[in-house]
């Protein structure tokens, strides 16, 4: 009798452990249960239970596989597949695939795929694929692939595709595609494609496409094209087009085209009014003659070429109006002596 009791006890423990282990294999719900004021058509025989039609004021249920329309909010503990529409917020604990439309926010714990539209923000934990449109911002913990349109900001680890924002596009790693920001575009690693903004483009590591800005472009290594009022790169192996172009590392064999070009590499190719390299000799010249009674100029002399900018006066008397001239010269030279 004693042996029978011990055997039954051990068997019950094994069965209980088996039951607990089976429960642990089920995916954990990311959200807590809450009030549900809606009409639902649900299949409870599956885990998690599938809701195929959901109509109500606000809903809180396991999984949507179909159509959900709510006046206030819609919350799924697991996944949402189909169309999810609410007046204020849509929340999916894990993944959403299909259409999400809300007045304030769409929030997905992991990945969102499809068409996502909100009055304020779209938030995804890992990635957003498809078309995301928000009045305020699109925010993704991973990447945005496809099209992201926001009134203020698009923020993600990577962006690949088309990103349009009224204020800024900010990425931790890579921007690839067409990136249009109202004021600035920032990529922590590299930009591949086109960065277009009215103020500033910044690439934390390299620019491998085209940076086009109204004020300035900044990159550690430029392998593409920079076009702005001011362009800066530590290493320039591409083309800089602007009023002022600067690169500060010796291994820069790209092209600088602008008014003022500054490079620490003696082999850099420069086309501009003032070209400065390590071997550039800066000379101040004072002269006079028939054309100018007196003139003062600065000459920037490189290995075979020079540029010169200065000012002078035709007449220095006091009985007539003073005339002032400005001039610029560029040319090539050959030294007659070593």
Residue ranges and their predicted role:
Residues 1-25:
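Bacterial Sec-dependent N-terminal signal peptides
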Residues 24-338:
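Surface-exposed, glycine- and small/polar-enriched segments that build interaction surfaces at terminal
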């Amino acid at each position: 009798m004693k042996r029978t009791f011990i055997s039954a006890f051990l068997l019950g423990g094994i069965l209980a452990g088996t039951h607990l282990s089976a429960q642990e294999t089920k995916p954990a719900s990311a959200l807590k249960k809450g009030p549900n004021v809606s009409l639902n058509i649900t299949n409870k025989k599956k885990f998690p239970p599938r809701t195929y039609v959901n109509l109500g004021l606000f809903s809180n249920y396991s999984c949507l596989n179909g159509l959900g329309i709510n006046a206030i909010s819609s919350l799924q503990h697991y996944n949402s597949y189909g169309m999810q529409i609410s007046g204020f917020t849509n929340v999916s604990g894990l993944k959403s695939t299909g259409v999400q439309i809300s007045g304030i926010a769409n929030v997905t714990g992991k990945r969102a795929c499809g068409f996502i539209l909100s009055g304020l923000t779209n938030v995804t934990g890992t990635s957003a694929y498809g078309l995301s449109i928000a009045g305020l911002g699109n925010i993704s913990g991973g990447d945005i692939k496809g099209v992201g349109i926001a009134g203020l900001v698009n923020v993600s680890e990577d962006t690949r595709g088309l990103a349009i924002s009224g204020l800024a596009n900010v990425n931790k790693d890579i921007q690839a595609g067409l990136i249009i920001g109202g004021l600035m575009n920032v990529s922590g690693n590299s930009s591949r494609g086109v960065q277009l903004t009215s103020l500033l483009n910044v690439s934390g590591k390299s620019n491998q496409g085209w940076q086009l800005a109204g004020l300035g472009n900044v990159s550690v290594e430029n392998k593409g094209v920079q076009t702005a009022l001011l362009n800066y790169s530590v290493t320039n192996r591409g083309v800089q087009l602007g009023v002022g172009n600067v690169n500060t590392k010796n291994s820069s064999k790209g092209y600088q085209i602008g008014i003022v070009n500054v490079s620490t590499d003696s082999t850099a190719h420069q086309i501009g009014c003032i070209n400065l390299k390590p071997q550039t000799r800066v000379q101040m010249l004072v002269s006079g003659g028939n054309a100018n009674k007196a003139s003062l100029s600065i000459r920037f002399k490189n290995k075979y070429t020079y540029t010169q900018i200065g000012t002078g006066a035709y007449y220095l008397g006091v009985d007539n109006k003073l005339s002032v001239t400005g001039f610029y010269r560029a040319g090539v030279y050959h030294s007659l002596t070593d």
